[in-house]
Every structure is written in C-alpha cells, then in structure tokens.
C-alpha cells in the first residue's frame, strides 16, 4: 500500500518507524509541521517525524496550512492509497481528506468516544481511569468523531505520568495502526460508528490549568501532577516563588491545606485530606532537585504556604 504518513512529535515516531520497516507498505512521503524555533538557543528545529523521514530519504511536506492548494496538488500527485495520522497538529480540509483511496486513518490515544481532543492521556490519568488505550479511526471533519477500525487497551498504573503512559500507547498503538492498514488493503476490516454514549472531551492543558490546587483531596492532587508531567509541568507558588513540582506520594500525615513540613525524606504539603510528600522540585532557572534539600537551603519561614 502506498502511504503518506502525517505526524509531528515523538509519540508519532514508533508508528512511522513500523510502517517504514513493514514489508506490506511503502511510505512515499511524510507530512509534518514546519521547522520551528525551539530551545534556549532559539535554533530552528526539525520535528521528530521530519528527522526520521530524512534518515530514510523519504520526501517531507511541511505545509503551514493544510488548506494550501499546492499541498493538495502535491498530495494528489503522490497517489496515496492511505494516509495514517498520529498527532499531526493541523486541521485537514475535506478536499484533502478525500484524496487517499482509503482516506486518513488517525491513531488517537484514548478509547473513543472517551476523551476526544488534544490531551486524552492527561485527561485519563487526571480522571482516575483504570484503563485507557488507542483507537484507529477514519478521519472526518468532526473532532475525533469518525468511525473506528480497531482499538487496543492499556492499564493505567498508579505511578504513571502522562509521559510514561503515552510512551507505551505510542509503541503499542503503532502495531494497531499497522494491522488496520493491513486489514484495509486486504478488504478484511470495516469501520464501526462511534457510540453516542460515553462521549467526553480532553482539551489541551494550559500552563495555568497545570497549577496544583492543594485544596483538593490528596489522590486528586497526585493524579493531577502525574497527568501534567512532563508537559506542561505541574507548578505551585511557595511564598512568592513559582516552582515546578514532580510527582508526589500520598501519605497518612495530616497538615492544613498548603501547609509545608520539611523532613528528611522530602517536603510534605497539606491537602484537603492527607499530606503528600514531594520528592523533587524545580526552582526558576534551576534543574530538578531534591525538594527537601531545596527547602532546607531556602530556609522557609514557618508561615509560608504552598498555593
């Protein structure tokens, strides 16, 4: 099958790599976001998908907008049988969706119709879901509403950060995506409309939304921090200092909401239920470090609170 792959960030890499190595499919081009300025050095950086394509000599298309007529013309010239998509990051107009013979097959990291949107992994952890997964579905104009070809499930571990879980979903979802393309080519697979029940949404997590709310129960605080780790990163104010915080451990200790207790094994902060132990913290301009060591060095006043 002639394939044009669309994707941008690191979680899309396992799927592209698997298709490149597949004996059944030929990746004739890759579509990714344009090179962007990133990092402290403000260097122009190629996307992970663009870099992988370059390694294998695969042509790379980087339209600023997928509605660009030149992009549609180039895509049509390639005559793709199918266009798999993993976290591409651009909306595709209908004339572009109509070009591949089998359409665009999107790998979405949730069990649709649950958690449609930009942050399904973060939403599943934050909500306390025990199981999530990935869905391969036919892309259409609506947001993650297309009929589903297949799913795979993944149990959410008690210590999973969004980065941990996304890594497993990206690897296991790649196998699902390849099997769906195999089934489409063989005429052995059909898409099933999504249920109207169980629909939920997962909008992009903003930096403001990543702030820790210590007035919530300890388990909720724990899930929230893991859900926004590594990006955009959980943060809080300690006094007048804004710091990023790493995952926490729920304890049986009792402290007032936002109250801080510095101990040998870390920094304890009170929530609406019990205290949580914070192992690592990242002050402004610094690397991640031991929260206890930082607090002892900072010599926090007794009345200082996390908020």
UniProtKB/Swiss-Prot annotation:
Cystine pairs: none
Annotated (6S)-5,6,7,8-tetrahydrofolate binding sites: 110-113
Entry keywords, A to Z: Protein biosynthesis, Transferase
InterPro entries, A to Z: Fmt, Formyl_trans_C, Formyl_transf_N, Formyl_transf_N_sf, Formyl_transferase-like_C_sf, Met-tRNA-FMT_C, Met-tRNA-FMT_N
Catalytic activity: L-methionyl-tRNA(fMet) + (6R)-10-formyltetrahydrofolate = N-formyl-L-methionyl-tRNA(fMet) + (6S)-5,6,7,8-tetrahydrofolate + H(+)
Record bears the keyword Hydrolase: no
One of the record's GO cellular component terms: cytosol
Function: Attaches a formyl group to the free amino group of methionyl-tRNA(fMet). The formyl group appears to play a dual role in the initiator identity of N-formylmethionyl-tRNA by promoting its recognition by IF2 and preventing the misappropriation of this tRNA by the elongation apparatus.
HAMAP family named in the record: Formyl_trans
Protein name, entry field: Methionyl-tRNA formyltransferase
Gene: fmt
């Amino acid at each position: 099958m002639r394939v044009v792959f669309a994707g941008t960030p690191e979680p899309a890499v396992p799927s592209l790599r698997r298709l490149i190595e597949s004996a059944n499919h030929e990746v004739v081009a890759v579509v990714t976001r344009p090179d962007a300025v990133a990092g402290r050095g403000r260097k122009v950086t190629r996307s992970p998908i663009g870099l992988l394509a370059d390694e294998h000599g695969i042509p790379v298309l980087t339209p600023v907008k997928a509605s660009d007529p030149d992009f549609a013309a180039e895509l049509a010239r390639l005559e793709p049988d199918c266009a798999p998509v993993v976290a591409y990051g651009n909306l595709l107009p209908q004339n572009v969706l109509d070009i591949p013979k089998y359409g665009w097959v999107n790998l979405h990291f949730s069990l649709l119709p649950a958690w449609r949107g930009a942050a399904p992994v973060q939403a599943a952890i934050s909500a306390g879901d025990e199981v999530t997964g990935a869905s391969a579905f036919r892309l259409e104009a609506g947001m993650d509403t297309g009929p589903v070809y297949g799913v795979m499930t993944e149990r959410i571990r008690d210590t999973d950060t969004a980065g941990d879980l996304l890594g497993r979903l990206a690897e296991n979802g790649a196998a699902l995506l390849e099997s769906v393309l195999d089934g489409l080519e063989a005429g052995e697979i059909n898409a099933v409309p999504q249920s109207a029940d169980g629909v939920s949404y997962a909008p992009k997590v903003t930096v403001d939304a990543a702030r820790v709310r210590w007035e919530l129960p300890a388990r909720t605080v724990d899930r929230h921090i893991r859900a926004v780790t590594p990006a955009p990163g959980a943060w809080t104010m300690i006094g007048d200092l804004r710091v990023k915080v790493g995952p926490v451990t729920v304890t049986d200790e009792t402290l007032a909401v936002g109250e801080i207790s510095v101990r040998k094994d870390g920094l304890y902060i009170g929530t609406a239920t019990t205290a949580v132990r914070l192992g690592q913290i990242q002050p402004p301009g610094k690397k991640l470090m031991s929260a206890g060591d930082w607090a002892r060095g900072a010599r926090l006043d007794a009345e200082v609170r996390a908020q």
